[in-house]
From Swiss-Prot:
HAMAP family given in the database record: SlyX (MF_00715)
Annotated protein name in UniProt: Protein SlyX homolog
PANTHER family membership: PROTEIN SLYX
InterPro entries assigned: SlyX
Family to which this protein belongs: Belongs to the SlyX family.
Amino acid sequence: MPQTQELDQRIAELEMKIAFQENTLEELNQALIDQQFVLDKMQLQLRYMASKLKDLQSSNIASQAEETPPPHY
C-alpha cells in the first residue's frame, strides 16, 4: 500500500509540473504573438519613415553639404 501512495504522489507531482509547463508555454506563446504584432507595426512605421525621407531627399531642398555656410563663418 505505501508503494501505491508513493506512485500516486509522484503522478500528482508530475501532473502539476505538466500543468505548470503548459501554462508557461501559453504565456510565452502570447508574449511571442504580442512581440510579433509590435514588430509588424514597427516595420510599417520604418517603411513609412523611409518613404518620407526619400521624398525629402528628392525634393528641392538642398543637402547640408550643398548649403552655403552662414555669414559668421
